[in-house]
């Protein structure tokens, strides 16, 4: 989960309260969220869904249904896992609060571990639990598979970062290496929160790369 800057313009289909998944809404959310699932960070999203941060409960809360600020770009896997009562409230709005400031996103070997930095911040705690679940939930065979797909994709990104950091150690003035690192650490990149957290936690080795974390 990464901080997102929304387009303020309200799509026409939302203004008219026709539907929340018409083409204009889909394209705006896809653009604003960089075609990444806002929960797990996978990119591109092959099975996108428009997720309501606060559920509308089949129209019980109609004001939530067409509120652009309540609509998020999600993959089906994460939307399914978030659809539990414990996540009806207190999941971070990543357009309002910066998850990187509040949560540590770590990959240790092939294990994803996500933890709130402040255990008294209920939104950070609940969000960390949700992100942990989308990478680690094993209650059905399909979820085991889909979690592993995300871990595998995350491993590819982390390995690309580590390989590039090795090249950077021996050739830090290489324009190609610098550009590659900037791309890997950009907010728009897949699983950016994990890669950026790695660099921040090793900034004694790479102090100048903190400038790449935009």
Located regions from the model:
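Short, charged surface segments at domain edges that flank catalytic/cofactor-binding sites
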Residues: 1-36, 59-66, 161
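Phosphate-binding glycine-rich loops and adjacent basic patches that engage nucleotide phosphates
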Residues: 32-40, 119-123
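Histidine-centered nuclease catalytic patch
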Residues: 39-73, 85-101
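Phosphate-binding glycine-rich loops of NTP-binding sites
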Residues: 77
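Ligand/cofactor pocket segment of small-molecule handling proteins
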Residues: 81
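Conserved, surface-exposed functional patches that form binding/active-site neighborhoods
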Residues: 86-169
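C-terminal, charged low-complexity interaction regions
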Residues: 132-214
